[in-house]
């Protein structure tokens, strides 16, 4: 990627490269929670396919989740450093050198090289877990795995603490379609006779007897045979898990009640969101998961948009029925070839950006005031003046934006 590319040009080149690699497994480090979200939204705003890395036989995987699961169940495979409070640290720039991998100063290319090296070591030292990671990088394979194994084992991380669970697959969420598992640390007999109302009260009281598997986010699922070699669970607990799973398997009524429970919780969640703010409060830039998918006709217009010149793209933007796509298209023309816009439209977009950037309130986006504070923070932290060139360049950009939108 050349430095003089615009954001749109960079996104187009990334898309072309990813398509050239496809079908592929796209692996990163904390990429599903961070990099992938940034990438998806960048593609979305550029009228490209935001789900490119998970469609058309493409899959995605996250090495951070794999390391957390591996360290929990098989802690001697990869070395994980600890901080001064004796807590394990999974930051890439610390895990890499701790395992003898040069990290290349935590720049983008260095992160890629370090991720590749860690992946190679996991594949060599824990081939079964590596295989499980690759299998679970595909949604359909996760569902197959759950249906084929009466008991599965997985980990969850909250506030830096990773915990292991054994669970039995019950149902898919009636709204969100995620697989729902019964947590086998609970006794299913305690729940079989409960009404939906009682199940709900029990769940909301803090007894989280059901667990959600985000099957589109590369969960690492392990079998009983794999976990028996771990030592994380007591053998007596594993025997009890087998008995509990058989109880669940023989009682379909609990699955029906769980579906009703999930429906109730989802309806309450929707009602709460409606009371807190309507769909009208959601900006186009944050609507990737909230505004639905484009119609077939809008998808066709998107394809025409890619092939057209900038003059033709303005007329295509007016044909979108999805107002978000029209908005993004107009913004792209404003940024890339503003001469193609009528003066009134160009002025409206310019003023909208000006209002956003000049706001002195706490906003969902970065304002010029936020930008200036970031520059000041970099200056304070740069005690040896090693970032002088970067700071100078950032100040020039800030000055340019101030003059452009004053």
Give residue ranges: language-model regions:
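Acidic catalytic cores of enzymes that act on phosphate-bearing nucleotides/polynucleotides
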Residues: 135-214
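Helix N-terminus capping/helix-initiation residues
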Residues: 6, 183, 195, 251, ...
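Conserved DEDDh/DEDDy metal-dependent 3′-5′ exonuclease domain
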Residues: 1-74, 228, 234-241, 245-246, ...
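Structured mid-domain segments that build the active-site/substrate or prosthetic-cofactor binding neighborhood
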Residues: 204-247
């Amino acid at each position: 990627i050349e430095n003089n590319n615009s954001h749109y040009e960079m996104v187009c080149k990334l898309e072309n490269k990813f398509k050239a690699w496809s079908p592929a497994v796209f692996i990163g480090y904390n990429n599903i929670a961070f990099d992938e979200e940034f990438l998806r939204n960048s593609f979305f705003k550029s009228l490209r396919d935001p789900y490119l890395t998970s469609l058309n036989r493409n899959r995605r995987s996250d090495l951070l989740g794999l390391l957390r699961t591996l360290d929990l169940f098989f802690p001697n495979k990869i070395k994980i450093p600890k901080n001064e409070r004796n807590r394990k640290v999974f930051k890439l720039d610390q895990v890499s050198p701790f395992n003898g991998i040069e990290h290349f100063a935590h720049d983008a290319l260095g992160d890629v090289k370090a991720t590749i090296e860690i992946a190679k070591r996991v594949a060599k030292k824990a081939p079964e877990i590596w295989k499980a990671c690759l299998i679970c990088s595909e949604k359909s394979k996760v569902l197959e795995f759950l249906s084929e194994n009466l008991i599965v084992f997985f980990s969850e991380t909250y506030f830096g603490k990773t915990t292991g669970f054994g669970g039995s697959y019950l149902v898919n969420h009636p709204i969100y379609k995620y697989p729902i598992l019964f947590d086998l640390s609970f006794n299913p007999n305690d729940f079989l006779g409960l009404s939906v109302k009682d199940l709900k009260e029990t769940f909301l009281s803090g007894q989280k007897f059901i667990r959600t598997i985000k099957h589109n986010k590369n969960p690492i699922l392990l079998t009983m045979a794999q976990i028996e070699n771990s030592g994380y669970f007591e053998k007596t607990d594993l025997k009890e898990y087998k008995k509990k799973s058989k109880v669940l398997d023989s009682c379909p009524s609990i699955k029906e009640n769980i579906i009703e429970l999930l429906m109730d919780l989802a309806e309450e969640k929707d009602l709460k969101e409606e009371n807190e703010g309507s769909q009208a409060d959601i900006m186009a830039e944050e609507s990737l998961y909230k505004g639905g998918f484009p119609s077939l006709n809008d998808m066709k217009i998107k394809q025409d948009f890619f092939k057209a010149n900038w003059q033709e793209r303005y007329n295509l933007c007016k044909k979108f029925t999805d107002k978000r796509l029209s908005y993004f298209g107009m913004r792209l023309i404003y940024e890339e070839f503003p001469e193609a816009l009528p003066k009134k439209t160009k002025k409206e977009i310019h003023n909208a950006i000006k209002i956003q950037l000049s706001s002195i309130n706490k906003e969902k986006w970065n304002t010029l005031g936020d930008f200036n504070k970031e520059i000041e923070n970099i200056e304070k932290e740069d005690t040896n003046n090693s970032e002088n060139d970067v700071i100078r360049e950032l100040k020039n950009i800030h000055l340019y934006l101030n003059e452009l939108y004053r």
